[in-house]
């Protein structure tokens, strides 16, 4: 092959060695679901404290979804209003009213995060959507479509999700029953393939009974899954049996 140089060109028959481009995968960000109950979000000051706690995880590089309950006492007030209005209430309208407490909390939490420089937006259960069966007042989650939340994670945004609620097959709001916000958090963590699900309460561990009621309640250093499930089946609020 003639390898004589042509003016302005490299020698014919010679090839430059290609540059090596690193194709190493980027490290995956940890993904966390954080659930805050009614006492933790009981007023605006506590919601601000929650926002600061979430910001610490965001600053550490995590993708965060927050699940919130209604502010303490709100759901009971909503239930009372329903019963005062109608003795024989429609279960679908009952759910529409009772689920509104979480809507307020999620919006306030998103605003509190934005106030301290964290990109965030709120989602109601039907917006995600969290799809349930049609058992109003005690619905079970069938599936969660996480596509929109995951897209927002890519934009560096925190997702604040209203717990305790979903979307039934009749396109109506459903509620999940007692402990429904815990159920939302665990189900969302599973759907997002989260690294962990943190459930925040105003009690610093697992006790033999509620220490806020029984002064002699004993804190348990260790507990098996079987013991935890038995406690939940007997009514303990530390774990949602569903």
Language model feature labels by segment:
Residues 19-242:
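Nucleotide/pyrophosphate-binding catalytic subdomain
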